[in-house]
Every structure is written in structure tokens, then in C-alpha cells.
Amino acid sequence: MSAGSSSLPVTTIYGLSTEGYKLASSIALKGAKVSLVDDSAGMAISLKPDLARTYPDVNALIEDGPLLAVEPTDLAINNAAYIFFAPRIRKTGHDVKIDVASKFQDAVKHVKKNSSIIYTVPTGFGTNSENIALIEHITGMTMGKDIFYYYMPANTIPVSNSDLHIGTYKARQDSQLAKLLSTNDSRKKINFVDIGSLEILHSIRILGHYSGMASILEICRYVREGQTTTEITKGSFNEIYLDDVASGLYDLRAIGASLGGSSPLMYLVNGTIKSIEAYVKHLIDETRMMLKKRDLKASRTKVTIAWTMDQNEMRGDKLDLLSILEARLKDYIGEVETQHGSFDFYPTEKTMMVIACSKADFNNIVKRNINSDLIVIRATPISQTLL
């Protein structure tokens, strides 16, 4: 243990996710004792500073997982003064809430008195109050007296203000937590705010991001062949790829799930979600239209969905959309595959069609396959095609 590490509390991160590892690595490099729980294995990895320096991300860590020192999950949580809840979420629909609640109960039942729980999963309105009630029920402790709770939603939406906001129970300030989360960037401040206020701030950020996007997706569905002028296709709004649409979808659904009854906000959230679902259908229709326009037979065509994504990020919405897109394309086209990372396409007897789901993927495909006969479709509001 390094000098100065004795001033930092023992910390456990629950969840072998990209966000969880980023937290664990950052805290370990400060010299704190850190454990990283793999809930699927029921074990915790002891993350020392040298390991945090060796493994740049969770993918590299997972590859060498069997070689790392581990301890039981209950012991890692019980020894910790601070427990960050950052699991990988892979369930969808109504199963999401049950899955997250199950993981949270697993983390909470082993906490000790005077420990602090930091919930990093984005929520809607009132979910944190439910979490607090659950903690008190499971542990028998009193919130704010025997145990403490914070809300720190992991953010995927770019923000102009780089300050970190942490929701606290009864506006409690925590200098130790601030130390664990501090960075070398003097411009980034840590602000403790009321939990309810942070739920509102996060919801405004998500809805502000998606309301404009949903409007673009809906309007662009009215663009017909022959109307795709340079002004339309070169517009910045046509740089919205499927990857961008999926980035905060979990958060949007969480907000919708927390709303009851009928209200303008409920209609706004549900309408936005339906726009995204319609966008996926539109992409499939565009692919089918391309086959028809070029007089291509589905049996003689191979479609590759090119979408490079982080397989271990907390939210599973990109994987879910990828699965939906792949399944629906297979209803019309016999051979459909997914690829990520390096895109090298070799000649085959079939016509090759590639759907680029992010700007980085599109640029990579074009760069690596300059002389190829690929048909490349950009997964944007106005799906442009390159041959």
C-alpha cells in the first residue's frame, strides 16, 4: 500500500462493467484498497495499482481474469466503506427492473454499518427513494445514521459543463467520497446536491438530447427519393447514426418506466422511444428498397451489420438494438452477419451490402475497402448509399 493510501477508505465496485472498471482503476491508482466484483462469477478481483496500470480497460482485464487474485463477493463488500453499484445490464423490457433490483439486493445484503452505497445506474423519478427503502429493509439500518446513500448516474451524453454532480440523502456532504472521485482537472468540480434534484437534472439532460433527435428522425422519414438534395444529405442532422441514437436509450426508458398515468411528459418520452423503434424499421425498409432498386435477389445477397461497440458497457441497449436489427433483416435476407473493429471484406459470389452503424465504422469501412464493390449504407436519418 502506497504512502498516503491509509487516508483513503477501502472501496468495492460491484459490476465488471466498463464504467465500473474505470472507477475502480482510478481509485486504485490513488492508492486505495479496491475490489472489483464480477457478479456473474460471485467473486471479487483485488485491483492493485500495478494491475490498474497494466490493464487499460475491462476487456483486457477479463482476458486474464483466471490469473488474478480473487476473494468472495460477500467479504469484499463487507470490508468496504464505499460500495459503487455499476453492474452490466443485459435484460430488456420489463425484465430490466427485476434484473437490476436482484443485483442491487445482492450487493446490499453484505454491507456493514457506516458504509456508503453509490448507485451509478441511471434512474427515472422516485427510484432512488425505493432503493433507500430497500436498503433499510434488508439491512435493518437507518439511512443517514447507520448507512449512507448517493446517486451518481453514469453519463453517456456529452455535456458542456464537466462538473460531477452527486445526489445525496438529505444534502449530506462527503469529503472522503470527493477524494476518491477527484481528478487532476482543476476545472472539474464535485457538487453534492439533493437526490431528487439530480433525478430532474439527469432527466432534463436525456430528454433535451433525445427530443431534438426524435424530431429529426420523424421529419426525415418524409424525405422521398429525388428530394435528397445536397442541403439535406450534407446537413449535420444526417450525421446521427444508430450508435448515437442508442447511447442513452436505457436512461430514456428508465424515465418512462418511472412515470405513471397520462401526462405530456409521458407522451413525450413514449413518443421519443417509438421514434427510435421506427428508425430501426426505417433502416430495414431502406435495405429492402435497395435490393429492389438494384434488382438484387435476397438469396444472392450478404448483409453485414458493421457496429463497433463496447461489449462490457453498463447499458445493454446497443446490443439489444443490434440483435433486433439482425433478426429482422434475417426475415428477408438469408445471410446476415455482424462485425466490429477491423473491416476487411473479401470477394464472394454474393453481392455484399454493409450497414455502417456509426460514423467511425463508416469511415473505417470506406478507408479499408477503397477498391471494393461493397454497397455501403449509412445508418443515418437519410440512409445514403455508396457503391
Question: Can you name each region flagged by the protein language model?
Answer:
Residues 9-28, 36-40, 273-323:
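Glycine-rich adenosine-cofactor-binding loop
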Residues 21, 87, 103-105, 109, ...:
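Rossmann-fold dinucleotide-binding core
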Residues 199, 209-296, 301:
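Interdomain hinge/lid region at the active-site interface
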Residues 15-18, 38-40, 86-88, 120-123, ...:
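Structural motif
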Residues 41-47, 125-130, 312-318, 361-365, ...:
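Short, charged/polar "capping" segments at the starts of alpha-helices
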Residues 33-82, 89-96, 135-139, 324-349:
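Conserved N-terminal Rossmann-fold NAD(P) cofactor-binding segment
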Residues 118-121, 149-151, 371-387:
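Short beta-strand elements of ligand-binding domains
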Residues 61-116, 343-367, 372-380:
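Rossmann-like NAD(P)-binding element
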